């Protein structure tokens, strides 16, 4: 930076400017050499580990860099101030972090970049791994027996890519990149266009011409040898691959999911793997004990990644460089930034890149295809696809599709030009965030004096789900009845009926509760309506509050929303599905599993934070409480 201004000239309206601006990185960048060199003379940069959050450096910082606000411990969350600029680098769920920032009264800015190519590369690698069994054969690299010897059983089931049919669910940028890559491997491509967002935001899919659109999801499943999910998690896509839908899957097909775990019914997928209907499965992240049991670890046709499908060193460097540019503008020019990349901007950026790098011949082909679709061109059946496969493969190998590594320097320029068009749209959101700063400032000051060693949301999920372990873990771990001991009358209230006040104030993390129906006809329980099926919330009269099916653990997401974990469902959280059914389908704490509490414990109203029409009227009885010593004990 050619000119360094004094920190006294930097406008900070919330509090007086310090002598030298200070930037703190929390739980994201340990090696700050790049930031320190780029901001030399402008601001100091320091990494603060979570073990040193009580040193006071977070409160004195002008800007804070972090990966996700939701995964930050509450002790660190309470030390953040409304006047600070909070940069969220590459958040996995922007909506959750933005909601939490609004609750805490923080000024949060998301910094991200497109990761479509990384996702497409990972999916292609997973497909090749399942087809060629490379992850299994690599363990036997030193064997001298050859494929005619002991390795022959391991090679059974290996498939060639040429001639296989790839079915893509969704129309995201990563889906289109995957289509181009799979066509290069001489695979046929089908796709099912899942509408996402408002209708006016939906653009025509820009898949390669050789790809064919299917009218229904069931048709795609029946015709595909490999299925890959590339759709966002919405009300319409929750468990888009449920047990009923998976009945149409082609026997011997492979399933790949690098999106949300809630896109598919994990119990149904597990059963199909056991039955052999699905030949293999690859997931980017898995939830719950059903994916961590011994049988999964021993199955060679199951691949599980630690949520790393969208990562690359290039992506992380782009995000850090964007954050540095934002800090320069903030410190030197006093510019309050907005979110640098949104989902819509990523879509525009990748679409324009394809247009710039594709020849005019393909533009004409796209127009012809669009016209033929408007005239009512019918989609292909699986038989027609096989007949016309040879001609489709020739069209797929045209030079216009080889655009992955070209014109990489044009991409940032296009993003900067488009980001200016979004300024007015973000202006109203920025005003809301600034108003929230003033209203929530006093609450943040008071809460920051409380316990600084509170667990983060992720730690709460782990601690609560540890009480609901898998069957393998239960052999070496005591049951809740063995762990929870009787306490003295001075430590716990003798009966939950004595609680008077708002339910949100009386219920704490780790409490065990029972939910009675409003008409007192029975208890709400979690149960499987069919063998090996999903978990539902039902009302039964022939159960007691001591039955594990009727017991739920309270897990707070923030001060206003809670989650209900089921003992019987292995710690899964209560949520609402697209059929307006109360189900237990996920272990992760998202907005789908968040509920607001209204009224008292005797007349409590649970309202889903995602769908306000999903309401559960119950009477809550506290069965067990967490004492000051951290031990959960039953109430007599």
Swiss-Prot record:
Function: Involved in controlling the equilibrium between tubular and stacked structures in the Golgi complex. Required for cortical microtubules (MTs) arrangement that confers cell shape. Cooperatively with IPGA1, negatively regulates cortical microtubules (CMTs) organization in response to mechanical stress and modulates pavement cells morphogenesis leading to puzzle shape, probably in an AAA1/KTN1-dependent manner. Regulates the width of leaves by controlling the polar elongation of leaf cells. Involved in the regulation of trichome branching. Seems to not be able to regulate gene transcription.
Region (Disordered): 1-21, 341-489
InterPro entries cross-referenced by the UniProt entry: AN-like, CtBP, D-isomer_DH_NAD-bd, NAD(P)-bd_dom_sf
The organism of origin for this protein: Arabidopsis thaliana
Signal peptide, first to last residue: none
Domain of life: Eukaryota
UniProt name for this protein: C-terminal binding protein AN
Feature: compositional bias, Acidic residues: 342-357
Result of changing residue 170 to D: In doq-1; premature opening of flowers and twisted petals
Basic residues bias (residue ranges): 417-429
